Amino acid sequence: MEYRICNGIGYLRLDRGDGVIASVLEFCRREGIRSATFSGLGGCDLAEVKTFDPETKTYGSRTLSGMLELASLWGNVTGDGNCGLAQHTHAVFAYVENGKHETAGGHLGEARVLITAEIEVRPVVGGVISRKTDPAWGTKVWDFGDR
């Protein structure tokens, strides 16, 4: 990963073998960013996408491999409530299977860069957002608390 910061916004270039989420979190740690949104695109060769099942309150997982166009990446980084960082990321991948163009998307577990990925990280200005557990679903949601 290499990056540049312009007017407070991080521009990350990920290279072959880099983890998308791992790189975003590493950038935030290096730069002392505790809350941010990010978006991006690129080419990957391995990705785990998940979908939440409200009946079981668990995530089903699917692993994609091969040439995967990272057509859309959107997520956020927040405090995890324990002095660390948490992320919530969704992605859509396009790929060819049996000669037919397909797409798959959902909550992103992680994706490995094949060619490159270009990601823009926008830090939250003037505050910090953290997470708490929603007792009804067992998922982590934004916690505005008294901040």
Language model: regions and residue ranges:
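N-terminal intrinsically disordered, cationic/polar leader segments
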Residues: M1-S39, D45-H88, V92-R147
